[in-house]
């Protein structure tokens, strides 16, 4: 079964579309969710969830699945897969500080739902009426690409006709304290992925085709496995984040490299989704694939990769 990307949503301070991930604005203010999706439903939601609402809304509309009347397909046909490593860290830290300084009884009842790791995936599903399988990944360096993989797996396994895949990381004091002061993207990206047949049935355009996914120890071995599955060298390589270890110059020599982290900040759990969105933007700007999206260096517990192709090259 061929799985395609039929919708993309990008909500970053310096980029609001897939092509802008390749050519971002020089400066921009932080994302203000109420300006994008209105105030309704934002109260008591943490920043990660608010950003996720914005990216989900953009992706579903871009895919033709959402309009002013709501979801245009049965909610049970849409799975929700989200990825974030730091999403509700500020809520957890605030709750722990309250317990340490006072007692558990002093905690906020409004904060309690946000303490669940699944709050992003569940909140987005409830807001948009997505009643298919619901997954939340907090899986370190490879989390975003893992989310894309599991969304494709749900589709290939017949559990859903399509899936919304979302990656988000907020920027706040708790996250910066945890990451040693590193600036995160303070934004989100979302993809709608579905079977080629499903997209064709509703007249949706395929913006990219998802190829094979690989995961294991070592970035070099990950790239070798991707090369075997594609049978070709990539035209563009989306680099993993290099906080823990640099990517050797000897890997994929001569291939153009694109480092989203260098441009936008620490992507962490959102990186893989951002990379796939950037690949779609590259195809839209006339690029010819394949594009390798990779996450995790040799210093991480694993490396992962996905190859994407433009629809015309599939």
PLM segments and residue spans:
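Conserved "HGTGT" condensation-loop signature of ketosynthase/thiolase-family condensing enzymes
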Residues: 1-133, 145, 153-157, 168-314
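Membrane-interface segments at transmembrane-helix boundaries
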Residues: 137-138
């Amino acid at each position: 079964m061929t799985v395609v990307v039929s919708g993309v949503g990008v909500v970053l301070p310096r980029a609001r579309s897939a092509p802008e991930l390749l050519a971002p604005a020089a400066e921009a203010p932080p994302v203000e969710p109420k300006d994008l999706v209105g105030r309704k439903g934002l109260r008591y939601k943490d920043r990660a969830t608010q950003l996720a609402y914005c990216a989900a809304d953009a992706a579903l509309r871009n895919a033709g699945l959402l309009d002013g009347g709501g979801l245009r397909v049965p909610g049970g046909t849409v799975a929700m897969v989200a990825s974030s490593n730091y999403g509700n860290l500020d809520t957890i830290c605030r709750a722990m500080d309250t317990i340490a300084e006072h007692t558990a009884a002093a905690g906020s009842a409004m904060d309690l739902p946000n303490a669940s790791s699944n709050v992003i995936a569940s909140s987005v599903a409830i807001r948009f009426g997505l009643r298919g399988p619901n997954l939340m990944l907090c899986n370190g360096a490879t989390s975003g690409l893992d989310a894309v993989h599991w969304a494709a797996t749900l589709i290939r396994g017949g559990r859903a006709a399509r899936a919304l895949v979302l990656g988000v990381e907020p920027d706040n004091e708790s996250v910066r304290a945890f990451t040693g002061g590193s600036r995160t993207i303070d934004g989100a990206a979302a993809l709608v992925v579905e079977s080629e047949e499903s997209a064709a049935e509703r007249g949706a355009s395929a913006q990219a085709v998802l190829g094979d996914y690989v995961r294991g120890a070592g970035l070099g071995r990950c790239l070798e496995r991707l090369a075997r599955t594609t049978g070709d060298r990539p035209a563009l390589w989306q680099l993993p984040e290099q906080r823990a270890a640099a990517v050797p110059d000897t890997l994929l020599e001569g291939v153009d490299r694109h480092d989203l982290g260098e441009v936008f900040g620490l992507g962490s759990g959102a990186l893989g989704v951002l990379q796939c969105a950037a690949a779609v933007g590259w195809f839209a700007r006339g690029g010819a694939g394949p594009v390798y999206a990779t996450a995790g260096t040799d210093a991480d517990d694993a490396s992962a990769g996905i190859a994407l192709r433009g629809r015309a090259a599939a």
